[in-house]
């Protein structure tokens, strides 16, 4: 099964929040499916962007349209209730996103408590959109968490050694958004695979927004 580990749906029927003046163009479920049809994609993960904040409406609508082969990666405030977690889990959400690069999510000081709570309650992993140059200072904290992934190969060559150490310890790494990184992608993929053959998850990053 070809699974797209990272994509975005932008549905203007639901709230969008300008990020430093940026608002993405519409990219609905039909646009996404048409884009990936040549690739044979059969499932995927719809990831909330900074411009979607804590809105769940667009994500629930997208998952309902896409069907059970697709899951959601959402942003939630620390005040989220157990009932809300249960409801989102039943709808197909499977992960929590901390967007430390662009904002729109809960902040770093809530990472451990919220990530642990979501994992213990509904089995979710937590995903970090972060410049890998900032990983060293939170490396020990990340290794205390049960299930973590890092977006876009960590973005920066300077922090790649930390990404490799984390991969060795079981942290997953999303191989997507190659236009965002400042290093040779092929070499990084080889190094991450050598560190942990199960670490890499490949995604289209469609429609390649400033998410």
Which residues does each PLM region occupy?
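An N-terminally biased module of ancient metal coordination in phosphate/nucleic-acid-related enzymes
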Residues: 1-58
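Hydrophobic faces of well-ordered beta-strands that scaffold small-molecule active sites
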Residues: 3-7, 43-47, 70-74, 94-98, ...
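Conserved, mostly hydrophobic/aromatic
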Residues: 5-6, 36, 44, 59, ...
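Active-site environment of divalent metal-dependent phosphoester hydrolases
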Residues: 10-12, 51-54, 79-82, 103, ...
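Short, acidic/polar
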Residues: 25-36, 78-88, 108-111, 158-159, ...
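Active-site gating/metal-coordination segments in enzymes
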Residues: 53-133, 169-180
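Histidine/lysine/aspartate-rich catalytic loop segments that bind and position anionic ligands
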Residues: 144-146, 150-169
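H/E-rich (His + Asp/Glu) clusters that bind or coordinate divalent metals
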Residues: 161-211
